[in-house]
């Protein structure tokens, strides 16, 4: 029996740091709403089901202008989010009726693609709990209440954690249920919930430094440029494949002609 893979896309944030008055997940990147890119990546992957978590007042808008408009057929439910990210994840997990694995992704990370999703699926099946990230390029300081440095962790031990964050479904669901029972709102990512309540080690694997989370106007500009570059490279790859195909046809024709002459 084939294992079922579900995904949760979080798009319920208010985007206060953006200062635009528009929830960041609906800001346009190359004429598409930001959350479009995450949904597109999952639509093009082997994920079976997508749960979209958004603001309660935005459910109808998401259905009509994003899910239906762009034919995201894998989105089976659009559910209202919670007061914090962890609550939105919990509601997303509650909306999944049946799954073996779940990938949890921030809708404000547009640089995800189907290739990264497939990588996530491979690693979660192998390790049960895994997270996309990248080794930190910068030195990180631990500071006190007055912003004085108190400790400098060894940089080679530090990673910048991203999403998707991927888990066995029952493992992460039970971990979140325990967290909610304890009224514990300290977790800043899903891996921390599983580390604390699931008693399972979380494997980190490399995604890409361009897998940024859009939270500021500067991030919008960066994401727009990166989407543009990705489209250019995609077109170049298509052109390259067409040239190879045409060359192969030409070689085949010449070989056939030489054979006929003999």
Language model segments and positions:
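Conserved alpha/beta core of the MobA/IspD/sugar-nucleotide pyrophosphorylase nucleotidyltransferase superfamily
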Residues: 3, 159-261
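Short beta-strand segments
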Residues: 8-12, 53, 104-105, 132-135, ...
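Hydrophobic packing residues within well-ordered alpha-helices of enzyme cores
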Residues: 18, 42, 62-66, 120, ...
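Conserved N-terminal catalytic core of the sugar/cofactor nucleotidyltransferase
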Residues: 35-98, 182-183
């Amino acid at each position: 029996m084939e294992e079922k893979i579900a995904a949760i896309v979080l798009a319920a944030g208010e985007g206060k740091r953006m200062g635009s008055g528009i929830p960041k997940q609906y800001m346009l990147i190359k004429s598409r709403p930001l959350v479009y890119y995450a949904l597109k990546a999952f639509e093009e992957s082997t994920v079976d089901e997508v749960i979209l978590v958004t603001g309660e007042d935005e459910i109808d808008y998401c259905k009509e202008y994003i899910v239906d408009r762009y034919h995201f057929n894998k989105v089976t439910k659009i559910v209202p989010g919670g007061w914090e990210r962890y609550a939105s994840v919990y509601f997303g997990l509650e909306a999944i009726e049946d799954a073996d694995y779940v990938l949890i992704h921030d809708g404000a990370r547009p640089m995800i693609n189907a290739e990264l999703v497939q990588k996530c699926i491979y690693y979660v099946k192998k390790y049960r709990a895994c997270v996309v990230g990248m080794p930190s390029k910068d030195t990180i300081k631990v500071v006190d209440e007055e912003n004085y440095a108190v400790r400098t962790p060894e940089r080679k031990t530090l990673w910048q954690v991203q999403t998707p964050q991927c888990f066995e479904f029952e493992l992460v669901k039970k971990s979140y249920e325990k967290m909610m029972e304890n009224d514990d709102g300290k977790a800043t990512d899903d891996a921390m919930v599983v580390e604390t309540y699931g008693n399972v080690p979380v494997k980190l694997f490399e995604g890409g430094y361009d897998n940024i989370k859009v939270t500021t106007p500067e991030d919008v500009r960066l994401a727009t440029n990166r989407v543009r570059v990705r489209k250019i490279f995609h077109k170049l790859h298509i052109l390259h494949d067409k040239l190879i195909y045409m060359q192969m046809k030409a070689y085949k024709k010449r070989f056939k002609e030489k054979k006929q002459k003999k």
